[in-house]
Amino acid sequence: MKFALGDRKTSWLCVAMLWIFLLILAVLRPLSLPDEGRYADVGRWMLMSGDWLAPRLNGIPFFHKPPLLHWLQAISFSALGVSAWSARLVPAMHAGLMLVVMYLAARTFASERVARNSVLILGSSVGFLISGQYVNHDMLVAAWISMAIWCFALSFKPSQHVDVNLSLLGFAACGFGLLSKGLIGFVLPGLVMVCWLLWTGQFGRVRQMPWIRGILLWSVISLPWFVLGQMKYSELFNYLIIGQHFARYVGDQFNNPWGWWFYGAVLVAMLFPWSLLILQDLRPKAWLMVWQTERKLAARHFESLLWIWTLCISLFFSLPQSKIVGYILPVLPPLACLLALAWEKWLVRGQSAAWFKVMLLVSLVISGVLNWQAGIYSEKRSSKDIALVLACAIEPKDRVYVTHGYPYDLPFYAQLSAPIFVAINWQQARIEQIDNWTRELYEGANFDQTAGQVLVQESAIDDPVQGSWLVAPNDIQLQSLSANWSVYSRGKAWVLLRARSTSVQDSSLESPPTAQGKSLKRCNH
């Protein structure tokens, strides 16, 4: 059936309105901790430093992930100023990319109505509207994985030669996926495509793909940073690829251990109430029973792609003990399409079309309420209140210490242009090797010992010099601190103290030199 131009305009209007709603939600809450505070400030440091090779947290190299998020955030901050919203614009742009590419692919594979309903289902879901404006790497890699799979799948047109241009777009998406979050950026699209091509009897057609040009394009996009980084930091490959990829995947010493059922429950929640359609209408068992007679039919290729995509990635992330909600985002587009197909079956059975509008409204309301609640929760843990006080009181040569914790959002909201001194028992932290903020900092200091000089022992805050500030959790026993500190401001989660001492500042404890070349605008004195 051919649809009039008005139907396509309606579809694009749906895409635009859902994306605008996501951008509005992004304004309504402070940075969540630890992720958003951490990653937003890494992008800010990149803008200040002008060092596009080494992402830095508090001036210390931070190589947990490749740098695409930080590059794009630095560009966003430069163009729009430093704010939580401009930080969130980067994942929001990728969420928009995910929505647009899914719409175009579903329109090609199925129909205009299925494509538009897929957009409405995905774009109104909790998983999309929250993760799409959450500052971390997950939405970026999910968008590029999705684009790679769609492009590769669309390139295998029935009874035709493989589309070279779409294949090259798929290779490019794999390159950006690698720069977003590492190996999964090309491993997962490859896994899905191999399984799908084998299932549908098309694997022999991979010979038609532009492998040489594709691999060259992928290499030009993704490899220069890894090569240059390895040349300057000899342990980069071992730390980023071996430690942060393979060790985390097979190890049991990291955070967030969950059972095999975890992602099934997460997906039901992320897509609620749309997920009720999956539970009632989409039965993998029934789909598997027809494989002998129908799996190679072109009419079945779209649905088989969606199921294989969902199952392969879900199983891949269910194997390790450590499981994080955002990992499963690449599964949302195929599930949204499966739900749209399920809705078509509901209509055939005579169900009222009005139920779609009801579920759409419920989904949007749930997303808005959860975003509001997330903001309340984040505000209770945020250091934004004392950061704004500090920004208006601090002098250029003042020194800021933190102890008994690390408020990731403090440097971001206070717009600090020098690193914070972090005063804890670092020897004990290295012995315990707990997977938390201390490990991020001392492992990063191994790459740059000069930058690591801001990691000081607790005794450094016993006799503060004039112009020193101290930030500590609100529940700290003030009696345990030196009498040379006095409370300057108390926030909801953190307390700001100022040094009473008039000691002359020791030049040996000056903030270590960094690559920063300019300060960001902060409160006028």
Describe each PLM feature range:
Residues 1-350, 412, 416:
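Membrane-integral, polyisoprenol-dependent glycosyltransferases
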Residues 21-25, 365-370:
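Gly-rich Lys/Arg/Thr-decorated short loops/hinges at beta-loop-alpha junctions or inter-strand turns
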Residues 185, 407-411, 478-479:
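Short, active-site-adjacent cap segments at secondary-structure transitions
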Residues 250-251, 263, 369-373, 441-443:
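Short glycine/proline- and acidic residue-enriched helix-loop micro-motifs
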Residues 300-303, 356-363, 429-438:
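Long, charged amphipathic helices and adjacent flexible linkers at domain junctions
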Residues 326, 368-391:
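Hydrophobic alpha-helical transmembrane segments in integral membrane proteins
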Residues 337, 343-369:
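Signature aromatic-anchored transmembrane alpha helix within multi-pass, membrane-resident enzymes
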